[in-house]
Amino acid sequence: ESEITETITADVIVIGGGMSGLCAAMSAAEEGAKVILLEKTNQVNFRGNDYGAIDSKMQLQINNRVDKMAAVQEIMRYNAYKGDQRVVRLWADHSGKVADWIMAKAEKYGCKPKPVPIDETVTPGTTVRGFATLSFRMDPSEVALNDAPKGTDPWTASMRYALKQGCIDAGVDIRYKMPAVRLVRENNNTGRVTAVIAGEKGAYKKFVGTKGIIL
C-alpha cells in the first residue's frame, strides 16, 4: 500500500486489451458502466483471426447450418470430457449472436464482413466429423489498416480496429503500459477480487472495481 501513488475507482476494471478484454469492456460500457481497461503494452493486441460460431448471420446466409449438440459432443470428446459441458453449450447457444454483434461493429467502422465458404472449413474424406464453425472474415478499411502495426494480417486489422474504436466511442478509459501486478481480495485475501494494482515500480496505481474485475 505504501508504494501506491494513486487510487482510481470505476464500476468495472478489465485486465488485458486483447479480443476478449475489448469485447468485455465495450459491452459493460454500452450498458452504462464506467470502465477502465488495463493493457501492459502500448497498443491493443490480437493473436488469432479464426472466429468460431454457430448460426451467425453470415453462416446462415450461405446455408451453413451446424448441428449444435453434435458439435458440443465432439468438443467434449476431443478434450477427453475434461471440460465443462455447460460452458461449451453456452458457446454453442450464443456464439452466433456474439459474431453478429462483432460484425455490426466492424461495419460501423468501415470494415466489411463476409462469409467463409463451407468447403474452406471442412476436410473432404476425413474420418473425423468436421463442423463448419468458422463464422466470418473481414476486409479492412484503409483506416483500420493504417492503424494496425506493420505486418498485421488484414482480417486481424479489421477486428482490432473495430473493437478498439468501439471501446473508445463507448467511453472506455484505456490505460496502456499498465501491467497488472497484484489482485486485491476481500476478507484477508480469501474473498472476491475488488481491485488490481498495476503499473511500474515507483508508480503503482490501485484500480478499484465497485462492480467487478474482469481478467
Say what each PLM segment does.
Residues 3-20, 36:
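Beta1/beta-strand and adjacent pyrophosphate-binding region of the FAD-binding site
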Residues 5-10, 201-212:
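Core beta-strand elements of the Rossmann-like FAD/NAD(P) dinucleotide-binding domain
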Residues 22-26, 99:
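Generic hydrophobic/aromatic pocket-lining and core-packing "Φ" positions
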Residues 29-50:
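Glycine-rich FAD pyrophosphate-binding loop
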Residues 46-50, 55, 124-126:
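Short, solvent-exposed loop/turn and secondary-structure capping segments
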Residues 53-91:
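Glycine-rich active-site loop/strand segments that organize a redox cofactor
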Residues 92-203:
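Conserved redox-cofactor binding core of oxidoreductases
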Residues 215:
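Flavin (primarily FAD) binding-site architecture
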